[in-house]
């Protein structure tokens, strides 16, 4: 088990204060020292793997610690209950990260988080392509504009449904001369939120590389078409099955995925640390 953890207060989102404090207080309560701006600790905790804005410098921290084989604890805004739950993982926030979410499950956890599965009875005909920020570790090596173009082509080989492109709200796409039947929908910020945007899952399917919309689509009952590194991949469908009924059993998956995110009170209590400690 690690003895100390580095943290970097100036490299966090402006709304991170209570969440980061809860994590640091929990570590200290377990006898783990927290060291500000240290590059020599046993591990590091960083806010997000989006190398952009205030968090740009986290990339240097991440690469420095990983190059030494040291774990990096990542805090990320949650996909289950955005603004109320927070994702905690080790080394990545895709399926390549460690969450400790596959075993020793609390089967009542989805209910505790007020999360339940929906089944679509009627949906709009369109397919949404939910694009990610190109500066995120999640899509390292992936050109998002090229990915969108290739996704459109693959969709057209499997369906004639209208396609709606949803860009990441803080990342511009270079998309010109879109084919007919393809439109762009600009995200709209929700009032009285820090950084939440409108997103509706009353569509036929959602194509997403490996971020929150894939998870949210699966919960909402909209077919998620995702990369193998997505946490939604176990309940995803392939492009070739886009016109088939979405009847995948999602019960186990929902319980498992609900063990990847925590409320502020749970961060203080240390449920997350109990889960990830084998990776530290």
What kind of region is each of these model predictions?
Residues 1-48, 136, 280:
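N-terminal pre-catalytic "stem/leader" segment of glycosyltransferase-like enzymes
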Residues 16-24, 54-60, 143-154:
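Well-ordered, non-membrane alpha-helical segments in soluble/globular domains
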Residues 192-239:
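A donor-sugar binding/catalytic signature common to diverse glycosyltransferases
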Residues 33-42, 188-199:
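Short acidic low-complexity segments
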Residues 8-10, 47-49, 75-79, 124-136, ...:
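Short loop/turn segments at strand-loop or loop-helix junctions that form parts
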Residues 36-66, 206-209:
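Short, well-ordered secondary-structure micro-motifs within conserved domains or adaptor modules
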Residues 85-124, 234-280:
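Leloir-type glycosyltransferase catalytic cores
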Residues 8-12, 149-192:
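Catalytic donor nucleotide-activated moiety binding site of glycosyltransferases and closely related
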């Amino acid at each position: 088990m690690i003895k100390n953890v580095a943290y970097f207060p100036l490299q966090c989102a402006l709304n991170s204060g209570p969440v980061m404090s809860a994590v640091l207080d929990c570590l200290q309560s377990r006898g783990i020292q927290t060291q500000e701006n240290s590059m020599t600790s046993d591990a590091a905790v960083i806010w997000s793997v989006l190398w952009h804005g205030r968090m740009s410098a986290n990339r240097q921290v991440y690469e420095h610690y990983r190059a030494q084989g040291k774990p990096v604890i990542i805090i990320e805004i949650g996909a289950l209950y955005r603004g109320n739950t927070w994702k905690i993982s080790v080394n990545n926030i895709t399926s390549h990260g460690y969450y400790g979410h596959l075993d020793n499950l609390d089967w009542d956890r989805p209910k505790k988080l007020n999360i339940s599965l929906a089944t679509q009875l009627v949906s709009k005909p369109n397919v949404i392509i939910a694009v990610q920020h190109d500066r995120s570790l999640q899509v390292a090596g992936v050109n998002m504009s090229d990915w969108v173009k290739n996704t459109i082509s693959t969709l057209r080989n499997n369906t004639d449904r209208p396609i709606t492109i949803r860009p990441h709200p803080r990342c511009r796409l270079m998309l010109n001369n879109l084919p007919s039947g393809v439109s762009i929908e600009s995200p709209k910020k929700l009032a009285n939120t820090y950084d939440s945007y409108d997103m509706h899952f009353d569509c036929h399917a959602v194509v997403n590389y490996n971020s929150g919309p894939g998870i949210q689509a699966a919960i909402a009952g909209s077919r998620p078409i995702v990369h193998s590194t997505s946490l939604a991949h176990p309940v995803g469908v392939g492009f070739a099955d886009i016109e088939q009924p979405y009847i995948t059993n999602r019960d186990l998956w929902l319980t498992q995925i609900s063990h990847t995110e925590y409320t502020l009170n749970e961060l203080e209590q240390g449920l997350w640390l109990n889960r990830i400690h084998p990776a530290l």
